[in-house]
Amino acid sequence: MASKPTESRIVTCESMTTGHPDKLCDQISDALLDAQLIRDPNVRCGIEAAASANEIWVFGQVASRNPLKYNEIVEIVRRVVRDIGYESAEEGIDPDTCTVRVTIDPQSADIAMGVVRDDGVLGASDQGIVYGYATNETPEGLPLPLVLAQRLTRALTKARTTGAIPWLRPDGKAQVSVRYVGDTPQEVTAFVVSAQHRAEVHIDEVRSTIEALAREALGNWVTSNTAVHINPTGRFVVGGPLADSGLTGRKVIADTYGGVAHHGGGAFSGKDGTKVDRSAAYAARQAALHLVRSKLAARAEITIAYAIGIDKPVAVSVDTFGTGTMPDEQIAELVALKLDLRPAAMIERLELRTPIFVRTARDGHVGHADLPWEHENTVDPKTEFLTRVAERAGASQGAPGRFPCGHLQRLGKEHLSVGEHFPYGAQGAELLACVVCESIEASATATKGGRA
């Protein structure tokens, strides 16, 4: 639902550093997935991790011709913990002495028969609902408070790993509240940062140093009225799994749209592309981005639903929150018919057989320009699409005011952005392509060289 132009509201989003216990588990799951993909690009994988104190559990299902061995899994787990920056059990977890327990089973034959069907089609590995969202309020296509919260956690991680703030430790979180008027962000009303630090550092130094870093990261969005909360409890020395247990998939809201859009509930990390709660969520994001970047909407949320063993979605819907330049139902038909949402097609288009996933577990699954699903991957409506329309013009026989396919009422060119003047037989005519199936209507009243 669109906000009223004068309505004031506050939207809050959060982000975690790489050393947060839940993010630690996400990175373990995706590091193992990446390692499996290097071994076997066709692996079917669902790996989760849990962490508490100085112990890590790895469990799940894998179907592969060349699965990782136990000692390889243990070494990858230790490497992830070490790369994040943990050094001892006293500060969170020790990469060299932590206990690693592994329980990996083959994928259920009942599930496998729906994924790899007898007819050779790759089916969805489960039923499920996924969502993709995009907005024009930031270059990343993400809500501003989420982008700002991510700036804070990335600034913390950079300051720690470069040694700029030597007493910072890996665990941390940030939260940013932004006031909107209508759909336009105005200012940061509050921000919260909780950063793990060494015991010998005084809280006053922690607060002043982190506040300066945060203000620089947030820039002009911070005002004199912004409420600031840095390590509100006064001490954050014990962190990581020693302070809080971690589990794969518990930060899917922060990793996607910050609560501004829906989430189907399925975790991403540790899952290969046959699992549509990951692959289709990425495809839905790609579709939403295209709608926004094509200026069909200022905001868009795509919903896709699947049935286990079936390759095509059972439902596709679109919500543009009142910002669409054409009805949402028509955009949904366009998405369903123009974008191949079968698992095999999504895996190929989004490059989901390549080892790119641990990066998403560290930095979030959307908003990074180098990720395949952040690319539009659709034809330019003014070039290739129109060429196909022109080529098919001679076969069209629609009555004025209707498309021959019967899908939709005729729309104005300002909505379709695909109307052009083409030669049509012996006459000139304006042709409008149905955005659903590309059938063509030739205006009966057009004259050569003129407009309908």
Where are each of the predicted segments found?
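Glycine-rich, mobile lid/loop segments that gate access to catalytic sites or pores
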Residues: 12, 82-237, 367
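Conserved beta-ketoacyl condensing-enzyme motif
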Residues: 43-112
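Glycine-rich anion/phosphate-binding loop at the beta-strand->alpha-helix junction
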Residues: 155, 201-292
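Internal helix-turn-beta structural module
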Residues: 299, 303-390, 449
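Periodic, rod-like helical contexts
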Residues: 408, 420, 424, 431-441
